[in-house]
C-alpha cells in the first residue's frame, strides 16, 4: 500500500463528502465566519471560502505543473459548481501525484509560473503541502458543518480510510513464553 496515495484518496473523497453536505445549507450558513481560524492559512474563513480553497488549491497545482501561468478565479463557489470542479480536477491531480511517486520523481522539480516571480517546487513538496494545508481546511469545514447540525463525517480522520478498520483488541490472545 502506498500510504501517500491512500492519504490523497482520503483527501479527495472527504472533500467530495464535505461539498455534498454543503448543498444542504443556505447562503447564511455557507458564508458565516468560522470562529476557529488558523493564522496564515486563510483570512476570514467561511464554509464556502474553505471548500472553494480546497478545490482551488488542486486546480492551482494542476495548472502550475502543466505549465500554465494564470489560475482562473474561483468565484463560482456554489456547492454544485464546487462538486463539478472537484470531479474535473480531482482525478487530474491524483494522476499527477501517482505518476510522480510511481516514477520516482518526488524530488524532481517543476517551475510554477503562476507565482510572481515564478518559483521552483518538487512534486513531493507539492503533495505534502496539499495534504497538510488541506487537513486544516477540512477540519475547519467539518467543524462548520457540525455547527449547522451535520455531524456524520466525524473528525475526518484518515485512519480507517488508509489502513482499514481495527479489530477489537479485547479479543486478542497473547502467547507468553
Predicted regions and their residues:
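Secondary-structure boundary motif
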Residues: 24-27, 95-102, 147
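Short, contiguous alpha-helical
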Residues: 5-24, 30-73, 115-177
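Acidic catalytic patch
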Residues: 99-115
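Helix-adjacent hinge/juxtasegments
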Residues: 63-104
Amino acid at each position: 500500500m502506498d500510504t501517500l496515495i491512500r492519504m490523497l484518496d482520503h483527501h479527495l473523497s472527504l472533500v467530495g463528502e464535505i461539498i455534498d453536505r454543503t448543498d444542504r445549507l443556505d447562503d447564511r450558513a455557507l458564508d458565516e465566519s468560522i470562529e476557529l481560524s488558523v493564522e496564515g492559512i486563510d483570512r476570514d474563513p467561511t464554509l464556502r471560502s474553505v471548500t472553494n480553497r480546497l478545490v482551488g488549491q488542486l486546480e492551482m497545482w494542476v495548472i502550475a505543473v502543466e505549465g500554465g501561468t494564470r489560475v482562473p478565479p474561483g468565484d463560482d463557489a456554489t456547492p454544485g459548481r464546487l462538486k463539478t470542479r472537484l470531479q474535473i480536477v480531482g482525478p487530474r491531480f491524483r494522476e499527477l501525484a501517482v505518476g510522480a511517486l510511481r516514477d520516482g520523481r518526488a524530488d524532481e522539480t517543476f517551475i510554477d509560473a503562476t507565482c510572481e516571480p515564478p518559483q521552483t517546487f518538487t512534486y513531493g513538496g507539492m503533495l505534502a503541502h496539499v495534504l497538510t494545508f488541506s487537513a486544516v481546511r477540512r477540519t475547519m469545514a467539518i467543524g462548520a458543518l457540525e455547527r449547522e447540525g451535520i455531524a456524520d463525517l466525524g473528525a475526518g480522520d484518515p485512519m480507517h480510510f488508509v489502513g482499514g478498520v481495527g479489530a477489537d483488541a479485547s479479543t486478542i490472545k497473547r502467547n507468553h513464553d
